[in-house]
Amino acid sequence: MTQELWRCGPFDFDLRDEPVIMGILNVTPDSFSDGGEHNALPDALAWAEKMRGDGARIIDVGGESTRPGATEVPLEEERSRVIPVVKALAKEGFCVSVDTSRPEIMLEAAEAGAAILNDVRAFERPGALEAAASTKLGLVIMHQGPFDPEKDVVEDAFRYLGRREEALLAAGVESERIAWDPGFGFGKTLEQNFEVLAASGRFLASGRPLLAALSRKGSLGRFTGRKNPHERAAASVAGALLAAERGARILRVHDVRETSDALAVLKAFGQADIRIDARGRS
């Protein structure tokens, strides 16, 4: 049974009713979709406020692009991009997630008021596991390869995430703090990406909440022919809805308003189904 509560520092998310939207806030010059758009602190705060108004309950702040081929930024640069934004958002009552793999940033973000650590390397960097365990924050672990078109990507991802969860538990992390991300768009073929999405039920067998991060990804662009990431909103919303229908409870997205509206319609249909079933049994 998948856990019903995700504990993230001072925030507890009830996952029984509807998915939680995590709005993406990249404070980078080179992120694949929105790099350079929110680098200045006032711009970042304004965009976060807009996303909150549109339905985002979590703001995911990233100071280093994780797109394939991106250049690693120095520690000091990531720190200067991320920590002031985290402090300002936390002061305004936001639930802040920080997309980082560096233990130094994890610890400073926790001190600055972050509630979630979102690590595409699943806390494998030296010191990251200990940094995560020393906090009470929510933790997201992600699978990203290595790329192998011949492997069973679903089972590979499931086993990898299971091992990383075991490492966190052994370090003293409570299971209610952990969420899984199968890593759509990371180290997978086009077909494997959609196998991971279709096999959401396999990951739910872990008992952990599932995070889906399909927003504006290149795989969606290849299917739709949309080379510009900004033109992939419709495909991104479709992917988010498919993930939600398959049990994903955290949706990491750029297009918050569109995703929120689509989820509202999906919920209305679900409630109509319940009423129809109830009448049929009466």
Which residue ranges define each predicted feature?
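Catalytic domains of carbohydrate-active enzymes, especially glycoside hydrolases
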Residues: A46-G62, R246
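Short acidic capping loops at alpha-helix termini that bridge into adjacent secondary structure
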Residues: E174-R177
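Active-site-adjacent loop and "lid" segments of alpha/beta metabolic enzymes
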Residues: C8-P10, R16, S33-W47, T66-C95, ...
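Short coil-to-helix leader/linker segments, especially the first N-terminal amphipathic alpha-helix
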Residues: M1-F11
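Catalytic-pocket segment enriched in acidic/His residues
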Residues: P29
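A short, charged/proline- and glycine-enriched loop
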Residues: E18-V20
